[in-house]
């Protein structure tokens, strides 16, 4: 019974997304941007958090991930910083890949987060006793910021694109964020023998 319901729901979902795809815009400049977001302790059953991040190249989405955490985090700052460190590693890996392919990336990659506190820690090596538990991630990101290999900036929660993967949203909010992902409903015109019956 459960497997039948799961199969039915899966087919309904797949039927509903058949015409959707990513619309790649013409690139005006090759620059990397990352967006990182945490839905801290969002699951009321087990208090685990969901994290997600996106990476854009020239305004086009090229990489994304979301994941429910395996452990409960007591501090949202620690979780946000771990996610920022993971996103930084992905961006640096992409930079090295583009360098090997002799593709020049313009400027310093920008990493957007909706936490003013985390953004402040990223550009300030002054620690206090409450941030010792995230010291390695802080040092890693600060090192990249000070070397001008990364620029961490604040973005308001309303503009935070990874919400589409990490939080339950209203239909209007989902549609708004879906447009920012450059996910588009394509219409296909079949002619003659190309028709699907």
Residue ranges and their predicted role:
Residues 1-21, 156, 166-168:
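C-terminal reverse transcriptase regions that engage the nucleic-acid substrate
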Residues 10, 37, 55:
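Conserved hydrophobic/aromatic pocket- or pore-lining residues that grip, position, or stack substrates
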Residues 38-46, 116-119:
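Short acidic, Gly/Ser-rich segments with clustered Asp/Glu that frequently serve as metal-coordination loops
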Residues 16-20, 41, 61-63, 97-100:
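Conserved helix-loop functional segments at active or binding sites
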Residues 12-36:
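Structured nucleic-acid-interacting core domains from mobile-element enzymes and related host factors
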Residues 43-59:
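Acidic, metal-ligating active-site segments
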Residues 31, 49, 61, 67-197:
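RNase H-like nuclease module associated with reverse transcription
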């Amino acid at each position: 019974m459960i497997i039948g319901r799961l199969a039915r729901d899966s087919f309904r979902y797949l039927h509903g997304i058949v015409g959707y795809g990513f619309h790649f815009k013409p690139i005006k400049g090759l620059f990397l941007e990352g967006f990182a977001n945490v839905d801290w302790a969002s699951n009321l059953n087990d208090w685990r958090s969901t994290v997600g991040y996106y990476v854009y190249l020239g305004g086009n989405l090229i990489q994304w991930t979301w994941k429910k955490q395996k452990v409960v985090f007591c501090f949202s700052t620690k979780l946000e910083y771990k996610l920022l460190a993971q996103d930084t590693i992905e961006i640096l890996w992409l930079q090295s890949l583009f360098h090997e392919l002799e593709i020049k990336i313009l400027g310093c990659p920008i990493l957007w987060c909706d936490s003013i506190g985390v953004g402040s820690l990223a550009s300030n090596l002054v620690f206090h006793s409450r941030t010792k538990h995230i010291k390695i991630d802080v040092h890693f990101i600060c090192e990249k910021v000070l070397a001008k290999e990364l620029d961490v900036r604040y973005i308001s929660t309303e503009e935070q694109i990874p919400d589409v993967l990490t939080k339950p949203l209203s239909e209007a909010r989902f549609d708004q964020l879906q447009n920012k992902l450059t996910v588009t409903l394509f219409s296909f015109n079949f002619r003659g023998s190309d028709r699907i019956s």
